[in-house]
Amino acid sequence: MRLVFAGTPLAAVPSLQRLAASGHEVALVVTRADAPLGRKRVLTPSPVAAEAERLGIPTLRVNRLDDDATARIAAVGAELGVIVAYGGLVREPLLSTPARGWINLHFSLLPRWRGAAPVQRSIMAGERVTGASVFQLERGMDTGPVFSMEERPTGDHETAGHVLDALAVQGADLLARTVDAIGAGTAVARPQEGEPTLAPKTTIDDGRVDWARSADEVLARIRGVTPEPGAHTSVDDVRLKIHRAAALRDAAPLEPGRIAALDGRVAIGTASHPVELIQVQPAGKSPMPAADWWRGVTTKDVIAR
């Protein structure tokens, strides 16, 4: 089949690579416009745009799928549109422009975690299993019938970044098999079953750790917002980012937010057992071992808030 592919971040690159290597033709790649990155704000193509260039596939770099973009996509004459984290809404008439419509690879077990941050929200909620779904795009947000779905267990220490990297590869294979089935006329899409949950985009506020929660909830929050937007707390009114932490289940309890050295480890209290801070990043500095940071803290009688 002749395809048009829409995607933007690194998580969409394995899907583009997999489809480009298949028996189908990726005639056009739609991605977000080049954006300023880094301290020097250099205009930089999206990871998908860069990969499309490497593969020699024409790109359409737009932030809105308006009438002009619709006309340019329609001119390609694709039979099927494929979306993986493009970052914009597909509305009519574009929704009906490819003969077979659009399918979307979503990184959750639909209808759970519909929205922009399914992996992050799943981990933050303490779930032990996530996965990927390929569904027919329709007007509702991630509501369309599902062609295929695969589960993936979430490890106790995996961050959202780790899980998303793994699902990007697993999902790419699932997506390619689904495209093959659609092309062969054997694909069957079934309505979503179960109670839907929503996964809105994460914000800086989502990264603030509430030490009055249990250790398990605290650690789930930290893993769910790592690497972005990142977990953080305030110590003496100075923001401290938390990159890695672990449970200290056998340690003596500490007041929620209280920081102390326990057997050479930097511990912080929660509503249950303490949590060990392993790697942190003080404001304006590079990431460092928590023990190094703690040695530089002059006032040891502190509570994180």
From Swiss-Prot:
The free-text function statement in the UniProt record for this protein reads:
Attaches a formyl group to the free amino group of methionyl-tRNA(fMet). The formyl group appears to play a dual role in the initiator identity of N-formylmethionyl-tRNA by promoting its recognition by IF2 and preventing the misappropriation of this tRNA by the elongation apparatus.
List the record's Gene Ontology CC terms alphabetically: cytosol
* Pfam families found in the cross-reference section: Formyl_trans_C, Formyl_trans_N
Q: Which UniProt keywords apply?
A: Protein biosynthesis, Transferase
Reaction(s) catalysed by this chain, per the record, are:
L-methionyl-tRNA(fMet) + (6R)-10-formyltetrahydrofolate = N-formyl-L-methionyl-tRNA(fMet) + (6S)-5,6,7,8-tetrahydrofolate + H(+)
What's the protein called, per UniProt? Answer: Methionyl-tRNA formyltransferase
- This protein's record includes keyword Protein biosynthesis: yes
Q: Where does (6S)-5,6,7,8-tetrahydrofolate bind?
A: 108-111
What family is this? Answer: Belongs to the Fmt family.
Q: Which organism is it from?
A: Clavibacter sepedonicus
Q: Signal peptide position in this chain?
A: none
